[in-house]
Structures are given as structure tokens and as C-alpha cells.
Amino acid sequence: MNKRKILVPLGEKSYEVTLEAGILNNISEELLKIGITKKRKILVISNEEISNLYGKKFLNNLKDNKFQAKMFLIKAGESYKNLKTLSEIYDVAFEFGLDRNSIIIALGGGIVGDVSGFAAATWLRGIEYIQIPTTLLSMVDSSVGGKTGVNHPKGKNLIGAFNQPKAVFIDPETLKSLPKREFSAGMAEVIKYGVIRDKELFEYLEIDKNKNELINLKNEYLIKIINSSIKTKSHVVSQDEHENGVRAILNYGHSFGHVIENLCGYGKFLHGEAISIGMNIAGKIAIEKGLWSKEELERQRVLLESYDLPTEIPKINKEDVLTILMGDKKVRDGKMRFILPKEIGAVDIYDDVEDSLFLKFFS
């Protein structure tokens, strides 16, 4: 399988995403290629499930090639993406003697990547880190773009930093052991890219043959959609690293998705499932504002559901919805900003959406 390389062009902070089936088996070689010498200490952060699948083999690969490496396992689940977990990482970093020339490797899904990246941003005022995402959602979304952080009891990702990785390595082979529900959750983000910027990708995902090959985890098809998704994200991030403008379009479906995650309790819906419902709500608002057609909303709904994603809006208290939305990071000068579709392949940012326009979708 051919190796794909995607540049994320951010001046001095530019880096490459390397996408290849089986790349985890040659990780030591890949690290040497990007200048990670064997003198540098490596702290690999993962979780128990990933460690059992790939982590031990990964760590042994590093040690067999004379890298000074240690692995620390954090607990899996959104409820552990917090300051306590971060503090535990700092303790291990101190005991291991992680200095400014050391490096952190995040081996796992989005939670591992977010926490590891923030630990790297804050340990000794910042050390380098590498993302090795093992879920579809983290491959196409959280591993690229430099958003790192932890949750606060009042909301998701309220504590964090923009911290670009030194490199990202993606091995689609890791998706073979991903639970089907987790794979579907990742497809929500892939479909999102189709709606916001890539009509061709959206249409590719609608074709039954492609759908079947993706569900059966054929590398060639996985690489195609991961490559397309990352190219879109890279292009947007390179224009607006710190989300002061156009980067906000990557949050399509996320404002309402975060509301659903928060009010239904973290864990009821996977992140991608909540985003799927959020995209359906955003699509309904777009119809109310006359931005796109019922046919386009229906195409989005059918595509989401064909990858086993939920679109039905759960019963949630309207007042709670407003409270959560006003605490959203996308609020500017007291105004909520919504990412709404104009057509398949194009969205825009709107701050003139009346509360009544979206509250009617909640009971």
C-alpha cells in the first residue's frame, strides 16, 4: 500500500501527516527520519485497551531499537479527560525525568490525543509531541490541527491550548479492532467534511459499493476517505490556526452535539453520534432560514443513518440548551455563532439565529 503524506502548512509549525497501512510496525524508523534521536526520552501515553492491542508491541519496538521509552496508561472514557488525569501524567513525567528535549507520543483515540497534547503544551512550558491516532474519529479530526485540552465540570474542552504536533502517523490497520459503533462515530466527522467543503467526498460516501467496502474496513477505501478528510482539515487550519474565522466551519454540528453530550450525560452518546444529531439540527435550522433544501437535509440524514448514526433529537430541557450554548467557545460578544449549510459542500457562519428557531426542535 502506497504511503500518503499530507502537509499541514503552518510556517515554522508545519508538519506532515503520514498515512500508511502497517506503519506502526516501522515506528522506530519513522521517528529517526523526523529527527527523533535515541538520546531523547519518549513518554508514550495510551490506555489499557490500546496497550493490549498495540501498545506493548509498540513499546518493545522502541526499546529494541534502543530508544529510552516508557508507557503510561490513562483511564479510558470522557469522564477521565480531566485535570486529575493531567496531574497523573505530570507525576510520571517528573519521575521519568522528562526534560525539554524529551517527547510525548499519544497512542490512542481522541481523548488520549487531547490530554497528551495538552500535557506536552504545559510540561516545562512546552515539549514536542507526536500523534498516533487509533480510531477513525481521531484520525480524521482531533489528531490534526493542534487543539488539545481537558474538560471542566462546566463544559467540554474549556481548559486547553493550541499546540501543533511534530508529526502525525496514521495506520488504518488499527481500525480492524475498533468496535463497529466507534467506527460509525468516526464516520460522522468524515460526512461532516463532505457537507462543509467536499461535495465529491459526500457523493463518494453515498455509493453503495464504497459504503460496503468501508464498513468491511478495506484499507484502500479507508485511506481514500481519511486522506480526503485530512486534506480539507489541513487547508482550513492553515488559513486560521487559532479559530478566529474560517476554522469555525469545522465545528459544523458541534455546538448542538456538545449540548447533547453534556445534557444526556457523557457516555450516553459517543462524540460522533452527538455530532450526527447536531448536524441534523443545524440542517433543520438551515431550512428554516431558507439556506438549503429539504432534499439536501434528507440526503444528509439518509447518509448519516446508513452508517448507523443517530439523527433523532433526544428530549432535553430548552432552558438547559440555552445555558450550555451560551458557554460555548464559539460565542462572540454574547452572540451565538452557528455553522449552517448552504448546499452539500458549502457552509457559512451565522450569528443572527433567533433562539426560537432552534429551541422548537427540543421538547
From Swiss-Prot:
Manner of cofactor binding, per the entry note: Binds 1 divalent metal cation per subunit. Can use either Co(2+) or Zn(2+).
A GO biological-process term: aromatic amino acid family biosynthetic process
Single GO term (MF): 3-dehydroquinate synthase activity
EC number(s) recorded for this UniProt protein: 4.2.3.4
Entry's Gene Ontology cellular component terms: cytoplasm
Locations listed in the record: Cytoplasm
Protein origin, superkingdom: Bacteria
Gene3D superfamilies xrefs: 3.40.50.1970, Dehydroquinate synthase-like - alpha domain
PANTHER family for this protein: 3-DEHYDROQUINATE SYNTHASE (PTHR43622), 3-DEHYDROQUINATE SYNTHASE, CHLOROPLASTIC (PTHR43622:SF7)
Role of this protein: Catalyzes the conversion of 3-deoxy-D-arabino-heptulosonate 7-phosphate (DAHP) to dehydroquinate (DHQ).
Stated name of the protein: 3-dehydroquinate synthase
Originating organism: Prochlorococcus marinus (strain MIT 9215)
Gene that specifies this protein: aroB
